[in-house]
């Protein structure tokens, strides 16, 4: 079965989301350091982090930055 472009795009988004989780696990706690770790732009990083916070895979603590969330 051949992959469609939407399947490929979905896989890329999933990989980027996992890279964000890996970045936070490895000590990146702000958008700048997460973006540098993952190689994504600030806007892409913000979009990914926002979804991960909404889904409780990450949480944001104002004085400490992003941390792994309740689902992890």
Language model regions located:
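N-terminal helix-turn-helix
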Residues: 2-72
